[in-house]
């Protein structure tokens, strides 16, 4: 009886847990063409041995930023073209570069908090409403839902 109850509880819990591949999450949000561009950005900018950890973070950033056309990943650098692929590519490259910096610094703290300090710093001039204060929490929440 106890085993049946635990199994029922476990199955009930699993039915509430939705996990997507990062590619599926992007396809569901932005369409098939965007998912293809996302995958290209990942393959070009994130090393193969890092993809399982970093690709879901890139997808989580897309969901957390929720930017409109040409700013989907929240990249505001003047050299970024206002295209989905450019946004995804710059985001992926930024994630990889900051991951490398975090590792070199001794992996102090968690990576998403480290990344957030660079990607969406609290008090930034381009954040007059203070929304960056939610960035780390949002990216962590979404990244737990996505796998490579």
Identify the meaning behind each predicted range:
Residues 50-69:
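Short, functionally critical alpha-helical segments immediately adjacent to catalytic or ligand/cofactor-binding
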Residues 2-50, 78-148:
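Non-catalytic cell-wall polysaccharide-engagement segments
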Residues 71-77:
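Acidic/histidine-rich, surface-exposed loop or edge segments in extracytoplasmic proteins
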Residues 34-35, 67-71:
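Short amphipathic alpha-helical segments, especially helix-boundary/capping motifs
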């Amino acid at each position: 009886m106890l085993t049946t109850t635990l199994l029922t509880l476990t199955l009930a819990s699993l039915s509430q847990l939705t996990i997507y591949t990062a590619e599926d999450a992007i396809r569901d949000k932005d369409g098939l063409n965007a998912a293809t561009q996302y995958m290209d950005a990942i393959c070009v900018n994130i090393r193969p041995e890092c993809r399982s950890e970093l690709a879901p973070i890139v997808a989580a950033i897309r969901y957390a930023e929720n930017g409109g056309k040409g700013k989907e990943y929240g990249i505001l650098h003047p050299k970024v073209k206002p295209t989905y692929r450019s946004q995804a590519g710059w985001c992926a490259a930024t994630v990889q570069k900051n991951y490398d910096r975090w590792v070199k610094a001794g992996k102090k703290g968690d990576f998403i908090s480290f990344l957030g300090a660079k990607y969406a710093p609290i008090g930034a001039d381009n954040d007059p409403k203070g929304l960056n204060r939610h960035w780390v929490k949002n990216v962590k929440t979404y990244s737990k839902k996505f796998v490579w």
